[in-house]
Amino acid sequence: MARKIGIIGLGNVGAAVAHGLIAQGVADDYVFIDANEAKVKADQIDFQDAMANLEAHGNIVINDWAALADADVVISTLGNIKLQQDNPTGDRFAELKFTSSMVQSVGTNLKESGFHGVLVVISNPVDVITALFQHVTGFPAHKVIGTGTLLDTARMQRAVGEAFDLDPRSVSGYNLGEHGNSQFVAWSTVRVMGQPIVTLADAGDIDLAAIEEEARKGGFTVLNGKGYTSYGVATSAIRIAKAVMADAHAELVVSNRRDDMGMYLSYPAIIGRDGVLAETTLDLTTDEQEKLLQSRDYIQQRFDEIVDTL
């Protein structure tokens, strides 16, 4: 059976997702959905022009909701980056009103298409929007996943790697909670060179607070520099999609609705063909557990506020 992935929204992030998927040969068939007909048609032709120079071939159809019925994965990149660029508060809720209004129509179209695969959400504020997609579509919660702090964790790994002169892939551990200002690095989970980082930090000149701030603010450095973020978050979504397509049973820190939290937030889960296959349990410190609950409460509050306006 052919592997199929849909992408809703072909802006900067959606195009980066499409390029990464197609270049890596993750699927055989792709469905591009975007309100800008000229743009999505141009992307279709542009990628078709690239096929002769790629190792993998991909078939692309555009703006055909019915074609999503048998898609394995759909990735939503809805948003309006201009709202974030003009946002003086430095959080990811500037796009909430705009994106939440789109979720209603897009979620309805997605449900009516007969899609029954795994929905991966990038759109900011991602935890609230992921919860809203699940609310609007009625899809099982385990089949609706947000990229969450998978990107923030990668930023933490980069910062820690730089501090220790290591490849970021040699750093393990997680950022948890909201993909936003209430997120935190769960330092009790972070290990470097086979040791807990807190042990190494106590013994050396390592400023964990500075590393955490770098992870939290990294996205805004990119946003201020080029006007948007794309490659980091696109790669996060692709990693989730690949875990689903391969039924990898991979442990990834994604925005998911845990039974003990009752709301979407980022916490490691086992990801495979059916989305979230199992929950994990981290041995967090008391302080980390309190931060997680505070982050959960904030996401819940913002979700309740937007649901009341629908």
UniProtKB/Swiss-Prot annotation:
Keywords: NADP, Oxidoreductase. Transmembrane segments: none annotated. GO terms for molecular function: L-lactate dehydrogenase activity. The keyword NADP applies. Substrate binds at residues 92, 124, 155. Its EC number is 1.1.1.-. NAD(+) binds at residues 34-55, 124. Can be applied in an industrial process for the production of L-amino acid. PANTHER family: L-2-HYDROXYCARBOXYLATE DEHYDROGENASE (NAD(P)(+)), L-LACTATE DEHYDROGENASE. Catalyzes the NADP dependent reversible and stereospecific interconversion between 2-ketocarboxylic acids and L-2-hydroxy-carboxylic acids. 2-ketoacids with medium chain length (five to six C-atoms) are the best substrates. Belongs to the LDH/MDH superfamily. LDH family. This is L-2-hydroxyisocaproate dehydrogenase.
